[in-house]
Amino acid sequence: RVSCRSFKKEPVEQDVLEAIFSKAQQSPSNCNVQPWQVLVASGKQKEALKNKLIQNVMQQQKPNPDFNWNIAYTGEHRNRQFGSANALYTAMDIGREEKQKRQMAMLRNWAFFDAPHVAIFTLDKYLDIMGAVDIGIYAQTLTLLLKEQGISSCMQGALGQFPGPIREMFELPDERG
């Protein structure tokens, strides 16, 4: 598995994307309800969303996620978290003490790592943990189908920190997160 953090500028053909998303829609879910909604932004819409998200981060707005974001990893999970961050920043030749470079690298999350498309997964909030499990299954299926077609992807939890611009752009009701 690879989380791609640098993408080609060329968009994926619409019919290819539609076929992949259609196939992914058949992912299993609890009681076969397929509770996810997938919102895809490309072109000018994606750029507008990127700009709004970066503006939120640059203005140091406080994250306002729809779901619990305040997870403090402990034990082996914390070790893996630090190991992952160390591997990432080492690959980018950014030292631990280079805070500004780390912040700039982190900012690329909200620029979607320059991917030509961004897919955002939402679900009704009341579905809680079962909905999260279903979205995880869907996300894995989508990732594998994309890879099968030679298309890289990167699952980004960071985007959930600032749902406001996404909610506004796609006119999401309050009960969806």
Residue ranges of predicted features:
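Acidic, surface-exposed loops and disordered segments
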Residues: 1-177
